[in-house]
Amino acid sequence: MTKLIVIKIGGQAISQLSTTFFDQIAQWYQQHYQILIVHGGGPMINRLTTQLALPVHKVNGLRVTDAATLVLTKLALLGDAQPALLAKLTQHHLPVLGLNAADNQLLTGELIDYRQLGYVGRLTAVNQVQLMQLLAHHIGILAPLALTETGQWLNVNADMAATVLAQQLHAEKLVLLTDVPGIIHHGNVMTSLSPQQAQQLIRTAVITAGMQPKVQAAIAAIQTGVKQAIITNAIDQPGTAIIQEVAV
C-alpha cells in the first residue's frame, strides 16, 4: 500500500474551501504523504451551458455529454475549475501541479453507453508509473477526463475517477468531500461502517439517493484494497469512514 491520499472535491466546494483544508493538506504533505486531488466542475459547466442555451440532461446522476457539452466540459474543468484550485493551493505555498489525461496518457477510458450518455466514460487504465513520479514532488490536481485508445476525450464522473485512482495507485485513504458531515442516522453522524452495514443502510433507505453514489464509490474502494474511505464535508473532520471491519 502506498502512502497516498486521494481526495475528491466537487466544483462547488472549490470556492468554499476553508483555511483548515489547506492546513490539513500541508500537514499531510509534511508527513510525506503523496496527495492527489481529483476535482469536479459541475457549477462551471452549468454556467457555460446556460450561457449558450444548451440543454442539460442527466441519467442516473451522469451528465449526458454530446460533442458540444464535451467541449464546454473540458473548458470548464481545465480552464476554470483547475486553475482556480491551483491558485488557492499556491496561495498557501503548497507545491501543486495541474494534470489531465493528455499528460503522457495518464488516464485511459472507454465509453459507458454512447447512445444513452454520449461521451461519458469510465477509467480503464492509469499510467501509474508516470503519475507516481509526478506525485513524488508535487500535490497533483487532476481533472476527471479520460482519453480512449484512439484519442477521444471522455467525461468521467469525479467520484468514480477518484475511486479508480485510489484502487489503481494502492492508496491508503480515499476522501470524498460532500456537503454534509457524513452519513447521518437518527440525527448523528455515523463514525464508521463496514461495506455490509453500508449496503444494509442503502437497502433500508437510511442512506438516501443523493448520498448513495458516494457510498457505493467508497465501498468499491474498500473492497479493492484501499484501507479507508471517508465521506465528510471537511478533511480535518472524521466524517463517516467505510472500513473493512467495524468493531462491535
Curated annotation (Swiss-Prot):
Site (Transition state stabilizer): 8, 214
ATP-binding recorded as keyword: yes
Main location: cytoplasm
Domain of life: Bacteria
Keyword Oxidoreductase found: no
SUPFAM superfamilies per UniProt: Carbamate kinase-like (SSF53633)
Residues at which substrate binds: 41-42, 63, 155
Reactions it catalyzes: N-acetyl-L-glutamate + ATP = N-acetyl-L-glutamyl 5-phosphate + ADP
Principal EC category: transferase
GO terms (BP aspect): arginine biosynthetic process via ornithine; L-arginine biosynthetic process
GO CC terms in record: cytoplasm
GO terms for MF: acetylglutamate kinase activity; ATP binding
Annotated family: Belongs to the acetylglutamate kinase family. ArgB subfamily.
Function text: Catalyzes the ATP-dependent phosphorylation of N-acetyl-L-glutamate.
Protein name stated in the entry: Acetylglutamate kinase
